Amino acid sequence: MTRAIRSVLFGAMLAAGLATCGAPAGGSTSGTLQVIAGENFWGSIAAQLGGSHVAVTSIVNNPNTDPHEYESSATDARAFATADYVILNGAGYDDWGQRLLSGNPSQRRELLTVADLLNKKAGDNPHFWYKPDWIERVADRITADYKALDAADAAYYSRQRETFRSALKPYHDAIAHIRSTYSGVPVGSTESIFVYEAQALGLNLISPPAFMQAISEGNGPPAQTVAEFQDQLTHHQVKVLIYNTQTSTPITDNLKQLAAQNNIPVVGISETIQPTTASFQDWQTKQLDALQAALSRQ
């Protein structure tokens, strides 16, 4: 289970008030689908798949904060109240969004909860956007949902899907290159964000699972896992350390420093897109290029 996601109560109260006052529950008079994404990684994908036929608002997009701790606002409530389509990550990552949906019931609004699509639940690792196969699966589902919401433009959404498939090629190529060149290389990660991608890359993620999960949930990791992680670094069992730039703690900062002291490259990766103007695939490919460069030094 990820760390508790706090939600501002007045946001839900305002959402209920909006519904009572007759604000539209969903639908757009302009012919453009109003899409709300809980996080900007799903928002980037949704925008590319919808093109000029959608207007996408991503709620969580600040690269300087921990998305696990996001607090919803009155502005978020208004956005949810008028959305045609909402995309949430699920699995406890953005429970604030579920509460805003409950405060704004609508028969017109469609919802995609990625965790449900992938048969995942609260307590499972929620970093689904770090698994390449699941990106394609989510993209297929968003495309199908757009077609259902806007059947007259189904052919347009099919073309957008193919364009996005082509745009993902450098991302998939970077993954394939690392997998073919560095399969089995032992690496470490300060948090569970890298678990799915390590599997896709064929890397051997040897960090204590209980440590990574505790950091992801905002808890103090068991002392024995901290000692084990430190030993892995001081004995050079880890060739590269992956560091989550958005969930840093004194313990993870210490591990980052310990890696540097032992000449182990550190590669930072983030929960949300950085910079915020980048596309999903450019953000991911840049991180993969940095990882490949670090691996090449070992």
Q: Model-found features: residue ranges?
A:
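Extracytoplasmic metal-acquisition and chelation regions
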Residues: 17-298
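Sec-dependent bacterial lipoprotein signal peptides
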Residues: 1-19
